[in-house]
A protein has these predicted regions:
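Extreme N-terminal starter segment of soluble prokaryotic enzymes
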Residues: 1-2
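Extracellular beta-rich ligand/substrate-recognition surface
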Residues: 6-12
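Glycine-centered loop/turn positions within well-structured domains
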Residues: 11, 40, 93, 112
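Residues that act as N-cap/strand-start positions at coil-to-secondary-structure junctions
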Residues: 12-15, 79
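Extracytoplasmic/periplasmic beta-strand context in beta-sandwich domains
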Residues: 16, 83-84, 103
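Glycine-rich beta-strand-centered segment in the early N-terminal region that forms part
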Residues: 19-37, 44, 48-79, 86, ...
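A glycine-rich, Thr/Ser-enriched phosphate-binding loop motif common to dinucleotide/cofactor-binding enzymes
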Residues: 99-114
């Protein structure tokens, strides 16, 4: 799968090929359709966010995508800027039909942290 990876704090994102994630216990793999990026993602890229991640990592916390034919929004600690991401099943918010992925990503920002 393709993913945008940050290899060093403050550096550019690089588009790379990675193995597809496998669902761990209690998780589902979400096929990402849209990602909300905001100031928290920028701070994470600089290493200045409350939760400090160590490179390399895939940014993107607010995601919208599909699991088994159903569209969901979710807030994940990282990994949204990839074609697929593992999400705890309890973090998946089912979305109503007719809501576009771009509209739905705004909902992910209001979800409780994982």
């Amino acid at each position: 799968m393709k993913a945008w990876v940050l290899k060093r704090l403050g550096g550019p994102l690089e588009l790379v090929d990675l193995p597809e994630p496998e669902a761990e216990e209690g998780e589902a793999v979400l096929r990402v359709e849209a990602v909300g990026l905001n100031f928290a993602d920028h701070l994470m890229r600089l290493g200045a966010y409350l939760t400090r991640l160590h490179p390399p990592f895939i940014p993107g916390m607010e995601v919208v995508g599909v699991v088994e034919g159903r569209r969901y929004a979710a807030l994940v600690p990282q990994g949204g800027l990839a074609e697929r991401v593992g999400v705890p099943k309890g973090a998946l918010l089912p979305l109503p039909e007719g809501l576009s992925p771009e509209e739905a990503k705004a909902l992910a920002q209001s979800l409780p942290p994982p």
